[in-house]
Regions:
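A composition-driven surface/loop motif
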Residues: 2-415
């Protein structure tokens, strides 16, 4: 596997340091005597999450190679691109402007390991049996949605490539940017699948999938987008079962609406939300991450199980937590053994507003710390964070004006 990205490292260390300072053990809870609300906001430049090239949408039409799609074939011009029957192959670094409509054409990116390939979608409609665009080798692929254009990609239910079971597939680091629109229909399984990192820095997205809308392994960072997602399984997902230090997600300045058959927004590693509007209209679990840190934004969730779930069966309990520093979180859960906010580790609320609708509020295995912000359960303001599970982890976290209770019983929280 490639060397792991550093983009999430600084924030993960900072967040863990904050939580460690607030809760040193699973047998005690703490509460500040101050009424001040603490707000922690990640650097707005988001330099630790994105590179300058992630934002660069510029290209020179005069020097770029071109691919013009037409029916079951294409015509090409320029260096580094060739067509054979219904397959277009891009073999080296450069800029390639794609336009036209096709049915049965696949664009393959098979460049050198140090080659950066820039693809510009300029009013493209592609349907194919397997992935419409498949990047199997390159240094980095940058895909720009040309300003004002609408582009559509689809595979088929007969997609026979199990490793590239998506309409758009990348085995290498992928960036999507621009101010155009991308419609994606994942008919076999996933909408967009990336084996390593996926950074998105703009655009409008309409994604449907019979599996996951986004399926990423190591890192998924999204900013400045508008997305409408309808997935039979997970909506926005990054997951790596082999390494708990990756599987990370960062979200800022987006408007994302998700309808999902399973998790709405899922990270096996650290999930950070800085700003934006996120609506999970239907899900089994709304937000899930090894750790979940909300610094801002407006988040609305409906789920049939836990609304927010901090968990990872492969991680240490000290790595698992839910922290709310700012923003607005509204969670409604279905009937049964459900919790609006569930953490297999600690819960810390330093600021923001949490509104929960359900039979209970919090379920946690570690400790609860409440230093600022407002918490409501079924319309009633709460003065402390109370564990809903009998024999659960640490005792309640007191309100910003009060004191935490004594240590609770042995851990026994709902997974």
């Amino acid at each position: 596997m490639k060397a792991k990205k550093w983009t999430f490292l600084l924030t993960s260390i900072t967040t863990l340091a904050l939580v460690t300072a607030c809760a040193q053990s699973t047998s005690n809870t703490t509460a500040s005597n101050s009424t001040a609300t603490t707000t922690v906001t990640t650097n707005k430049k988001t330099s630790s999450y994105f590179t300058d090239k992630d934002y660069d949408t510029s290209y020179d039409e005069k020097t770029a190679a071109t691919v013009t799609l037409s029916g079951s074939t294409a015509t090409v011009s320029g260096d580094g691109v060739a067509v054979s029957g219904s397959t277009v192959t891009i073999s080296k670094s450069g800029t390639y402007v794609i336009s036209g409509q096709s049915d049965g054409v696949q664009i393959k990116i098979e460049a050198g390991s140090s080659d950066d390939v820039h693809i510009v979608l300029n009013s493209v409609t592609m349907t194919n049996t397997n992935a419409a665009i498949s990047a199997t080798s390159a240094g980095h692929v940058y895909l720009t949605l040309a300003d004002g254009t609408t582009n559509s990609l689809s595979d088929s239910a007969s997609n026979s490539d199990d490793k590239a079971d998506a309409a758009l597939f990348s085995k290498v680091d992928l960036t999507i940017n621009g101010k155009g629109t991308l419609n994606v229909d994942g008919k076999k399984n996933n909408g967009i699948k990336a084996n390593y990192t996926l950074h998105i820095t703009g655009g409008t997205y309409n994604i449907t999938a019979v599996g996951d809308a986004f399926n990423v392994n190591d890192e998924l960072n999204i900013t400045g987008t508008t997305m409408t997602i309808d997935a039979k399984e997970d909506g926005v997902k990054v997951d790596n079962d082999d390494d708990t230090s990756v599987g990370t997600m960062y979200l800022s300045d987006n408007t994302i609406t998700v309808t999902a058959g399973d998790d709405g927004i899922h990270a096996s590693g650290d999930l950070v939300i800085d700003s934006g509007t996120y609506t999970v209209k239907n899900s089994t679990e709304g937000l899930e991450g090894k750790s979940i840190t909300i610094n801002g934004g407006d988040i609305t969730i409906y789920s049939t199980d836990d609304g927010v779930n901090a968990a990872n069966k492969n991680a240490q309990q000290s790595e698992i937590f839910f922290t709310m520093n700012g923003g607005n979180l509204t969670v409604e859960v279905g009937q049964g053994d459900t919790d609006p906010i569930d953490s297999n580790g600690n819960i810390t609320v330093n600021g923001g507003t949490i509104k929960m609708t359900g039979q209970s509020g919090f379920d946690f295995d570690g400790t609860a710390t409440y230093t600022g912000g407002d918490i409501y359960l079924n319309g009633e303001k709460q003065t402390e964070i109370v564990n809903s599970m009998p024999g659960g982890g640490g005792a309640p976290g007191g309100s910003p004006q009060g004191n935490g209770g004594p240590g609770g019983g042995a851990p026994g929280g709902h997974p």
